[in-house]
Amino acid sequence: MAFDKKLLEIVACPVCKGKLEYDKAAEQLICKFDRLAYPITEGIPVLLENRATPWQEQTAE
């Protein structure tokens, strides 16, 4: 099941309540403010603080 990008309009980071961005390659939602990544499992975002992992922005070399 694919992630529905329309959800980005209504979901928010559970920590700071800020906007989330979709990382299609990694199948996760990113909060750049808190630098956290939330997994997407079977098309459903898992927006639990204890399931978030630290996120580092990828830089091109």
Curated annotation (Swiss-Prot):
Superkingdom in the source lineage: Bacteria
Protein name stated in the entry: UPF0434 protein Sama_1339
Cellular component GO terms, alphabetical: cytosol
Family classification: Belongs to the UPF0434 family.
